Amino acid sequence: MAIQAAEISQILKDQIKSFGQDAQVAEVGRVLSVGDGIARVYGLDNVQAGEMVEFPGGIQGMALNLEADNVGVVIFGSDRDIKEGDTVKRTNSIVDVPAGNELLGRVVDGLGNPLDGKGPINASERRVADSKAPGIIPRKSVHEPMATGLKAIDAMIPVGRGQRELIIGDRQTGKTAVALDTILNQKSYNDAAGDDENKKLYCIYVAVGQKRSTVAQLVKKLEETGAIEYSIVVAATASDPAPMQFLAPYAATAMAEFFRDNGRHALIVYDDLSKQAVSYRQMSLLLRRPPGREAYPGDVFYLHSRLLERSSKLNEDNGGGSLTALPVIETQGGDVSAFIPTNVISITDGQIFLETELFFQGIRPAVNTGLSVSRVGSSAQTKAMSSVAGPVKLSLAQYREMAAFAQFGSDLDASTQRLLARGARLTELMKQPQYSPLTNAEIVTMIFAGTNGFLDEIKVSDVGRFEEGLLNHMRSNKKDVLDWITNEDPKIKGDAADKLKAAIEEFAADFA
């Protein structure tokens, strides 16, 4: 069979034409050394600070130290499968995470990967984890209340939408309980808002360095109460690598900023930032960065300030959205003057102080109302609340002062005895069981009863019973009064005070 030369040349031409030129160019480097979750990589000359890089087997890392001859990369995952000589690829993207409504009701890790077994998350967008905080011009003063449902906080240390309020205390003082109650309290408000996105508050809870069992318990509680529908849980637990614990708060803030930037409202709880600082210290020391006070690196203040500055209230031109932050800090032996606590106190707009002593006395939430402060929240209080809350702060401050002196002498004049009696009852009134947040109107009613002498003749041990009875009476017989406080937000004085007084008197007359 004769082979035609023309045919051969035609076949070759066709082959050349159909040759696929899908060559992929990737900038790669080699691992020089690896250990303790840190890899030293040679050859990634153009890598950016904070860029995501990829190791064999899909393990990801983040370039943090850009040095003259190598790059220090922190590894998001186990470093056991990475060895010297492995190739490392650039991804050309700064670390980003998924964001959007699709994340609501889900539990994810610090990179936005699902942990709850409910399938993949097809998020509408991705956001850079460590983005820049809004400037001065787009912001607005905090003026809308963010109700926690806790009497002691809503009355005396009010938090507004867009505020950063620190929750600080020793271990086992109920810090997470305060934050969790705040998330649960939003359910009634979100249900009442219906489709009005402007009134809803979405919640993001970040667990940093906690036990998995604790996080599982919290998620279970959110599911039982139905609060998971408007919440996102970001978990970087104690068994996760330090880089994941460092990244989780930034990633969660990026998810929360989706709501803020779309004219909606979000609340983010960082539980807790002490553990984030510890994991950042670990990474920095392993990267051979010079240590400073308490062996923390020099930029540990910036670590928290750039995170918390992203929580803000935006003005109407920028959508009017807000992001409220409740960072949690754990102190050692009540030492508030340690490095991290002082840093975060100076960054935030106030702090809620929880004390071990109060906790063991049975005063829960164990809020020290003398040391706790809200620097911007008073302008966000409802009119009804601010008109009844003033006398409480004063009465409790005087009570604390007098109680110290009263221990020394027994012959006290009548006015001092009255002050001590009322202070003891108000302190009792501020107690509240966990998972039972109250509405704004219910708190106003209870505090009004306390400051207007309705508790003065009742035994301290009966205050809880009186409160329970009064709340049931108001909910079943005087719902119109509660609705009036909620909808009209009147200043409780003059006729308004008389109306509320009459409703309480109706119950107090029959209480025994």
Curated annotation (Swiss-Prot):
InterPro entries: ATP_synth_asu-like_sf, ATP_synth_asu_C, ATP_synth_asu_C_sf, ATP_synth_F1_a_nt-bd_dom, ATP_synth_F1_asu, ATPase_a/bsu_AS, ATPase_F1/V1/A1_a/bsu_N, ATPase_F1/V1/A1_a/bsu_N_sf
Gene Ontology molecular function terms on file: ADP binding; ATP binding; proton-transporting ATP synthase activity, rotational mechanism
Primary residence: membrane
Any one annotated GO CC term: plasma membrane
Site, Required for activity: residue positions: 372
SUPFAM superfamilies per UniProt: C-terminal domain of alpha and beta subunits of F1 ATP synthase, N-terminal domain of alpha and beta subunits of F1 ATP synthase, P-loop containing nucleoside triphosphate hydrolases
Reactions that this protein is recorded to catalyse: ATP + H2O + 4 H(+)(in) = ADP + phosphate + 5 H(+)(out)
Locations listed in the record: Cell inner membrane
Coiled-coil residue spans: none
Membrane-related topology note: Peripheral membrane protein
Enzyme class name: translocase
Entry keywords, A to Z: ATP synthesis, ATP-binding, Cell inner membrane, Cell membrane, CF(1), Hydrogen ion transport, Ion transport, Membrane, Nucleotide-binding, Translocase, Transport
Keyword check for Lyase: no
E.C. numbers: 7.1.2.2
Positions with a binding annotation for ATP: 169-176
Pfam families the UniProt entry points to: ATP-synt_ab, ATP-synt_ab_C, ATP-synt_ab_N
HAMAP family, alphabetized: ATP_synth_alpha_bact
Family statement drawn from the similarity comment of this UniProt entry: Belongs to the ATPase alpha/beta chains family.
Function (record text): Produces ATP from ADP in the presence of a proton gradient across the membrane. The alpha chain is a regulatory subunit.
Complexes and interactors: F-type ATPases have 2 components, CF(1) - the catalytic core - and CF(0) - the membrane proton channel. CF(1) has five subunits: alpha(3), beta(3), gamma(1), delta(1), epsilon(1). CF(0) has four main subunits: a(1), b(1), b'(1) and c(9-12).
Protein name (Swiss-Prot/TrEMBL): ATP synthase subunit alpha
Species, as recorded: Jannaschia sp. (strain CCS1)
Gene from which this protein is expressed: atpA
